[in-house]
Amino acid sequence: MFSEEKPGRNFTDLPDVDDGYNIHVMYVLPKDGVDKEYDLDSKISMLMYQIDKWFNSKTKDRLFADGQNLKFDRKDDNKIDITFLRLDINDDEISKHGIQAVNVLQPAISRFGFNDPKKVYFIIYGGSNRDVCASSQLPSYATEGVTANTAALYYPGKRSGSCIENNGGFKPEFNETAKAALHEILHVLGAVPQCAEDHLVFKDEGTINDGIGGHLSIPGDIMYSVQSNKTYDKAKHLDFKSSNYYNHNNENCLDIAKSRYVIPTVSNPQLPTFSSK
């Protein structure tokens, strides 16, 4: 019995209890990573709870009176299905890619069979990152032939300035870590679409965000960011104007309220690539 085979730990994606369109959560370690058992000690489950609680609170009395929830992959007992995976590459080979590290993680987990076309993958990566605390693939910016279905939280993250600082870490509250995680999950679900009226694309100014889109320049929004990528603006809103990415009236533009990956789900739901241009 390998040391990582512990009671309650899953090494596979368990059979779905829904239609298979869901956000599958994974605790992923590099080859040389230390197992902190975040999948077993409720740390990851608590993070997902805080994310979903905040999302639901910001969607109440909008498209649905009781709001919506993120459609996480769950088990028969309604607990989140979390898969443990140790990769075959070392931390340095991932961390050095900075904000683009998620583009290393996606094909890495795919090699182990985590490539269900119905699923979006959210990775809690137990290692470092040269530049950022979290990052995501952007479906509307993906080039042909590239799979863009993965978002990642790097924990503890940055080698210079840990991601658990500035009111971060696994805590029973919607803090900086939870905000970063939800921000990236919304990215991989398609927010902010390029067709949104306030969609922001960063200029080429020699920063890690050069040329990256999918944001808003509206302080307080969960999708707000700045060119330098360094902001501790408190997230207060989820498209409070209902004009960019949630419950808006632009019928040809992606709307998270109509996503396949939220519940309740509308009758004709959208995938993250809906009207990507």
Residue ranges and their predicted role:
Residues D16, S140-E144, F170, G211-G214:
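Short consensus segments that form the blades of beta-propeller domains
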Residues R62-F64, I124-R130, L153-Y155, G214, ...:
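Secretory-pathway extracellular proteins and peptide precursors enriched for disulfide-bonded cysteines
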Residues K158-E251:
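The catalytic-center signature of Zn2+-dependent metalloproteases
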Residues N22-Y27, K119-Y125, A151-Y155, K179, ...:
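Structural recognition of the beta-strand scaffold that forms the well-ordered cores
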Residues H237-K277:
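A recurrent domain-boundary module in secreted/ectodomain proteins
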Residues N129-Y154:
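Catalytic zinc-binding patch centered on the HExxH motif and its immediate surroundings
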Residues S140, F202, R260:
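Cys/His-rich zinc-coordinating "finger/knuckle" motifs
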Residues F2-V120, I124-L138, I164-G169, N175, ...:
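Propeptide-to-catalytic entry region of secreted or membrane-anchored zinc metalloproteases
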